[in-house]
Amino acid sequence: MTAAAPGITRAPATMLPLSYLMAAAIAFLLACAGAASLAGPLTAHYYQPRVVALAHTVTLGWISLSIMGASYQLIPVVLERTMWSERLGRWQLGMLLTGIAGMVTHFFIGRWPGLLMAAAMVALGAGMHLVNVAMTLRGLGRFSFTARLMTMGFAGFGLTALFGLLLGADRIWKFLPTAFFPTLHAHFHLALLGWVAPMIMGVSARAYPMFLLAPEPDGWPAPAQLWGLALGVPAVVGGLTAWPALVLPGAFAVSAAVVGHLTWVARMARDRKRPRLDWGLRFVLTGGAFLFAGASLGLGLALDLFSGPRVAMAYTALALGGWASLTIVGMMLKIVPFLVWYRVYSSRAGRAPVPTLAQLGWPAAEGLAYGLLTCGMAGLAAALAAGSAPLIFAAGAVLAAGSLCFCTTLARMLWHLAACGQRPVPTMGAHTA
């Protein structure tokens, strides 16, 4: 068995990551419904109270909670380290849910003092997670590619939370020396490129080979991703806030990371031994196609080939909605069945008939969710670029239907938890060699 972190004898119980993931799924459903209800405001500039509230429902409520929840299950498996404190993770979730709800509400009504208080709670919750991860990784002997990118991502998460807190305070006291919109753009790209991108790229390097039954990736894409993000993210953020000449080199560096990641994904899909792709795998692979489209549009913005708020919102939809969201949906369709099966059936395996992981899913609903969400994300990006309220509403309605199918699938998986009763549940241990 692999070594555990100092002073730790067990990994978090399955309900801890499930709690995060279910809260995130609810936020995803609300965000998709919100896209339809805000069709009118989404045809105008992106900096409006209700649009910013929607954006933070996606980035904090959906994406960030998903990544944090998944980390409580993936770190023991991918990095072979048991989590430091399950109790801290539970307290952190309460802090984050309260803070995120407060931020979204105060963004919606445009009240800055209340927003700042809620942002402070989110920053505190983020800090608690970073402490938990830091203590978990303490003493890790070898930092693999995945460990390095995840460490980079958690550092980016902390900086993004701090940056957002400063932006909120600046709306009250006006102390930041830089112009507001370039600073806002820097905050967004720090979140996207410094937090979301390294986490997805790092985890996929270990998780996708397991899911696809493919060889672990190697070669030039590893340094391309690592150095592309390590050099590109500071350059983009610094260029947007202070030195515009850095934006283009930073964009090219990030593009190199994207090319490296997509090359790995394509190789794993080509060399896989799994003959048939389930819907979770189709989601993550389709997310790669959206990443290519979003990165191309982002590079075009850096080259001044495109400009304006409509193109910027289409770029955001491709990056956060197409790539990040579809990838997370696919990962959830792989992670949640495992967590439910482990909690309900692991102690009975070998002694009584138990369902397989595949039997916990609902392929019909997953397939419907795939069709609706992929078409809805593509349609939303096109509708935002066109600035058409009817098209945005239609795309939002399709997304809402797709997210409902996704959440219904998760609910059907969670129904198996009712079989637990009062039976003692084993704790999910770290992955063994």
Describe the residue ranges of each PLM region:
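Hydrophobic alpha-helical transmembrane segments of multi-pass integral membrane proteins
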Residues: 1-433
